[in-house]
Amino acid sequence: MGCGNSTAASTTPGPAESAKDVQDDSSMDEEKRRNYGGVYVGIPADLTNETAGQTASTHKE
């Protein structure tokens, strides 16, 4: 009995999870690109360079 339930349970959520993952990926991309009231949500590549520059300046002093 236990094996039958395990097999059925594993088969059912598989496809549902795959579809869910695809939707989540799209939603995440949209969330990153969205503009909330003029505030950009995301991490631009330039910001990484600025952070590195600030760290270097702080390290210098």
Curated annotation (Swiss-Prot):
Origin superkingdom: Eukaryota
Cleaved signal peptide residues: none
InterPro entries (alphabetical): OCC1
Stretches the record annotates as Disordered: 1-61
Bias kind Basic and acidic residues: ranges: 18-34
Biased composition (Polar residues): 1-13, 48-61
Similarity field: Belongs to the OCC1 family.
Protein name: Overexpressed in colon carcinoma 1 protein homolog
Gene: si:dkey-261e22.4
